[in-house]
A protein has these predicted regions:
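A cross-domain feature marking catalytic cores of carbohydrate-active enzymes
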Residues: 32-34, 104, 124, 158
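Short, solvent-exposed polar/charged micro-motifs at secondary-structure junctions
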Residues: 38-41, 165-169
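Conserved short loop/turn motifs at secondary-structure junctions
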Residues: 1-4, 159-164, 191
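Acidic-enriched catalytic cores of C-N bond-cleaving enzymes acting on peptides and small amides
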Residues: 68-105, 110-113, 128-157, 167-173, ...
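Short, hydrophobic beta-strand segments
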Residues: 55-59, 119-126, 156-160
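Short gly/pro-enriched beta-turn/loop segments at secondary-structure junctions
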Residues: 50, 115-117, 157
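Histidine/acidic-residue-rich, glycine-tolerant segments that coordinate divalent metal ions
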Residues: 1-101, 109-112
């Protein structure tokens, strides 16, 4: 809802904090994510980078029972796009941990009206920039194919998300700081 109202511009909280200037006077952030059940943790894992997209299919409304042939169904385009994106799954390498998520944000006005406007949110994420750029390209291709097949207009707005995060094996300095500030056993070193 906040994105729809224009109050948030990015799909990630940290991106939004940077956009509004909340990080302007901060040189480094050692802690950047919450984890339930653990006061502090050192994560020696990775985190996928991603690209977010706001997608709009534009069709032509018509009465769904009386004159559906006069309409161009934007909801059909969105449905086709979701199938197309799902069918790309086997083209991704397992080691790239590619994930593509999507949902329909606005999908019509009534059951008896051919939808002339559908908005979707899509996120393409992967372990490396090369992999999530490849996934993003395949998402765009899937969206364009759906628009072409249904005769709908298409607008894709791609927004930068996070870069991929790789583990830093030289984390002993941070561990010693946590030893000083945290009670015994109040942090974990996840490998």
């Amino acid at each position: 809802q906040l994105m729809k109202e224009g109050k948030l511009h990015y799909g990630g909280g940290k991106c939004e904090l940077i956009r509004v200037g909340a990080m302007d006077d901060i040189d480094i952030a050692l802690g950047h994510h919450t984890q339930a059940g653990c006061d502090m943790s050192i994560m020696n894992g990775t985190s996928n980078g991603f690209i977010n997209k706001t997608v709009t299919f534009t069709g032509r409304s018509a009465h769904a029972a009386g004159m559906p042939h006069h309409g161009v169904d934007a909801l059909n385009a969105a449905t086709s796009a979701m199938v197309n994106m799902a069918l790309q799954q086997e083209s991704y390498r397992d080691e790239d941990t590619v994930r593509v998520h999507y949902f329909i944000q606005d999908g019509g006005t009534a059951v008896n009206v051919i939808a002339d406007h559908v908005t979707m949110q899509v996120c393409a994420r992967a372990k490396t920039p090369e992999a999530y750029k490849d996934a993003s390209m395949k998402v765009d291709r899937s969206l364009r194919a759906a628009a072409m097949a249904t005769g709908c207009g298409l607008h894709i707005e791609s927004m930068a998300g996070y870069m991929s995060e790789m583990a830093n094996p030289h984390i002993e300095v941070l561990k010693s700081v946590l030893d000083d500030i945290a009670a015994e056993g109040k942090y974990t070193n996840v490998k």
